[in-house]
């Protein structure tokens, strides 16, 4: 209690010193009466206690409010009875913290103004009229110069101007500055006494205003790697038996918010990138990768159908959302492939190494995915030998018609093309590889997906 009373005495003395240094006596009387109340008060009540007219008290309070020395707030008073009306009162009070900031700012502006005046006295030469004693600066010389005589003449009385020595004015300025700061020394010392203290409120009822503004929140964003249960943001409310009331007037309420990682998204990206380097199918969409081939999809669809049948026999619920979700996704993918790969779907599966349009089952060399074998794409280098064609066609039922792509002088299956092989390809070889890749995807993935959907 002694420390709190001490800081109140320091702040009250500071306000009294500032008012007595820069304002008339009647202002000091109003401030002293306001300091004695230590609460928000109406101007008519303050006028009754000081025995001064209300309009005079309000005028002084408005002047002090313009200088940020006092503050006011509108408080709504509810009606007590059914026949009464609610009213709004204007209450006046002092904000200690705001006054400290205002006094520091005004002292800084005083010092800055005195320094600017001192610099102006040194840098700017002045001239004084001997007749009317008007003072001019060096900036006024062009309009004061007489072109006939070449002398400086006063623009008011045409008197002669003489150069004024700035030593006396500098001495007066320095003396005035020292006198000012000697008078303000007590205020500066009183300001230093407030440093290191917690500035209290002027009145207890002001605590309601700070509570209405809400407490300040501090969020502790500690990341968590686990997927365990999240701790409650309000530790006091975890148990009903140990729940307590949160004080809304508390200045700091700390919330512990655990931010989980992004569920291993970076790990999944790294795995897909590694598989693409091995298979060379980086340009395919994710749902057309070999890992999502029709064989795996058939196994997954069979397992899902078995699980759905078991759940339907055990319960009378509707089909699970997993089957519907897969069906919707596959329809979307089918429409996507139809629109983007319609050119390769409509093209005949023909073309050989010699440019003759033969069937894919013939003994000649076959190029999978060419748009017509009538000499339109004879410049393509993606060709097959007779022996390789026979071996590839013999394995067409098991391997899904694996296509050989030319990389320089070598022929490599399309599913084993790597990024290094793509870099070694020429422009024409890479174009042929792209056409063959999309043709391979549309034939081996789309057809089997469509058949599996039709069977379901």
Swiss-Prot record:
It comes from the Eukaryota. Residues 347-357 have a biased composition (Low complexity). Residues 345-402 are annotated as: Disordered. One of its GO terms (biological process) is transcription initiation at RNA polymerase II promoter. It is found in: Nucleus. A zinc finger (C4-type) spans 129-157. Residues 377-386 have a biased composition (Basic and acidic residues). Gene3D superfamilies: Winged helix-like DNA-binding domain superfamily/Winged helix DNA-binding domain (1.10.10.10), Zinc/RING finger domain, C3HC4 (zinc finger) (3.30.40.10). Keywords: Metal-binding, Nucleus, Transcription, Transcription regulation, Zinc, Zinc-finger. InterPro entries: TFE (IPR039997), TFIIE/TFIIEa_HTH (IPR017919), TFIIE_asu (IPR002853), TFIIEa/SarR/Rpc3_HTH_dom (IPR024550), WH-like_DNA-bd_sf (IPR036388), WH_DNA-bd_sf (IPR036390), Znf_RING/FYVE/PHD (IPR013083). GO terms for cellular component: transcription factor TFIIE complex. Residues 11-100 form the HTH TFE/IIEalpha-type domain. Pfam families: TFIIE_alpha. GO terms for molecular function: zinc ion binding. PROSITE patterns: HTH_TFE_IIE (PS51344). Residues 358-375 have a biased composition (Gly residues). TFIIE is a tetramer of two alpha and two beta subunits. Belongs to the TFIIE alpha subunit family. Recruits TFIIH to the initiation complex and stimulates the RNA polymerase II C-terminal domain kinase and DNA-dependent ATPase activities of TFIIH. Both TFIIH and TFIIE are required for promoter clearance by RNA polymerase. This is General transcription factor IIE subunit 1. The lineage of its organism: Eukaryota, Amoebozoa, Evosea, Eumycetozoa, Dictyostelia.
């Amino acid at each position: 209690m002694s420390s709190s009373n001490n800081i109140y005495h320091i702040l009250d003395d500071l306000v009294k010193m500032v008012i007595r240094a820069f304002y008339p006596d009647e202002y000091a009387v109003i401030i002293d009466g306001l300091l004695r109340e230590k609460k928000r008060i109406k101007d008519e009540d303050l006028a009754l206690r000081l025995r001064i007219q209300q309009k005079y008290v309000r005028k002084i309070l408005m002047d002090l409010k313009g200088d940020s020395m006092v503050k006011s707030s509108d408080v709504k008073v509810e009606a007590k009875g059914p026949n009464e009306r609610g009213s709004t009162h204007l209450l006046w009070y002092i904000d200690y913290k705001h006054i400290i900031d205002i006094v520091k700012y005004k002292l800084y502006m005083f010092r800055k103004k005195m320094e600017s005046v001192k610099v102006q006295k040194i840098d700017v030469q002045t001239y004084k009229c001997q007749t009317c004693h008007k003072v001019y600066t060096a900036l006024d010389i062009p309009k004061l110069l007489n072109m006939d005589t070449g002398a400086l003449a006063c623009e008011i009385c045409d008197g002669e101007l003489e150069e004024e020595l700035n030593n006396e004015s500098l001495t007066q300025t320095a003396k005035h500055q020292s006198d000012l700061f000697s008078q303000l020394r007590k205020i500066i010392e009183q300001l230093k006494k407030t440093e290191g203290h917690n500035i209290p409120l002027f009145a207890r009822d002001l605590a309601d205003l700070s509570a209405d503004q809400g407490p300040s929140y501090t969020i502790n964003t500690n990341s968590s790697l686990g997927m365990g249960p999240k701790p409650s943001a309000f530790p006091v409310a975890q148990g009903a038996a140990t729940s307590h009331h949160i004080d809304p007037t508390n200045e700091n309420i700390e919330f512990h918010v655990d931010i989980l990682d992004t569920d291993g998204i970076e790990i999944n990206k790294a795995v897909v990138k590694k598989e693409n380097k091995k298979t060379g199918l980086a340009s395919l969409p994710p749902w057309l990768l070999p890992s999502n081939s029709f064989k795996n999809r058939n196994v997954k669809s069979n397992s899902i159908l078995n699980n759905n049948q078991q759940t339907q026999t055990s319960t009378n619920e509707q089909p699970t959302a997993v089957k519907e979700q897969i069906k919707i996704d596959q329809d979307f993918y089918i429409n996507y492939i139809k629109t983007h790969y319609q050119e390769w779907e409509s093209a005949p599966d023909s073309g050989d190494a010699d440019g003759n349009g033969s069937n894919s089952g013939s003994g000649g060399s076959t190029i999978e995915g060419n748009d017509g074998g009538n000499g339109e794409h004879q410049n393509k280098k993606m060709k097959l030998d007779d022996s390789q064609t026979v071996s590839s066609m013999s394995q067409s039922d098991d391997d899904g018609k694996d296509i050989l792509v030319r990389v320089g002088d070598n022929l490599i299956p399309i599913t084993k093309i790597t990024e290094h092989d793509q870099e070694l390809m020429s422009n024409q070889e890479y174009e042929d590889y792209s056409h063959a890749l999309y043709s391979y995807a549309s034939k081996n993935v789309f057809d089997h997906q469509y058949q599996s959907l039709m069977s379901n």
